[in-house]
Curated annotation (Swiss-Prot):
High-level lineage: Eukaryota, Metazoa, Chordata, Craniata, Vertebrata
Domain of life per record: Eukaryota
Subcellular location: Mitochondrion
GO BP: any one term: translation
Record family assignment: Belongs to the universal ribosomal protein uS17 family.
One Gene Ontology term, aspect cellular component: mitochondrial inner membrane
Protein name: Small ribosomal subunit protein uS17m
């Protein structure tokens, strides 16, 4: 009994940039879940791709979307950078669209509305004399 192994030739890949030392090239690590047929458990399988980054806009830690090239540029570079999905350090909450760090939102002082104390007291209809 033989197990049929199929290789995945993905045209679009999402991964994390792990190196940008080469000129106009980003080193991207992609993690996939692979089923072990004997244990029936999924394990992480990592693969490293080299992608052409013409504008050198990637930094280490970015989450990027890669597109397969119809013809390889070099022996190792077979993908190109299509989009930077998330810049490192600039995480955006998908529901609210605000920047966040962990479970707290990062609000700049420009975004905060400042209202005078007298206006807040008028809204509450409080008086200082009783």
């Amino acid at each position: 009994m033989s197990v049929v192994r199929s290789s995945v030739h993905a045209k679009w890949i999402v991964g994390k940039v792990i190196g940008t030392a080469m000129q106009k090239t980003a080193k991207v690590r992609v993690t996939r879940l692979v089923l072990d047929p004997y244990l029936l458990k999924y394990f992480n399988k990592r693969k490293t791709y080299f992608a052409h980054d013409a504008l050198q806009q990637c930094t280490v830690g970015d989450i990027v979307l890669l597109k397969a090239l119809p013809v390889p540029r070099t022996k190792h570079v077979k993908h190109e950078l299509a989009e930077i999905v998330f810049k490192v350090g600039q995480v955006v909450d998908p529901v609210t669209g605000k920047r966040c760090a962990g479970t707290t939102y990062l609000e700049s002082p420009v975004d905060l509305e400042t209202t005078p104390l007298a206006k807040n007291l008028e809204e509450l209809s409080l008086s200082t004399t009783q």
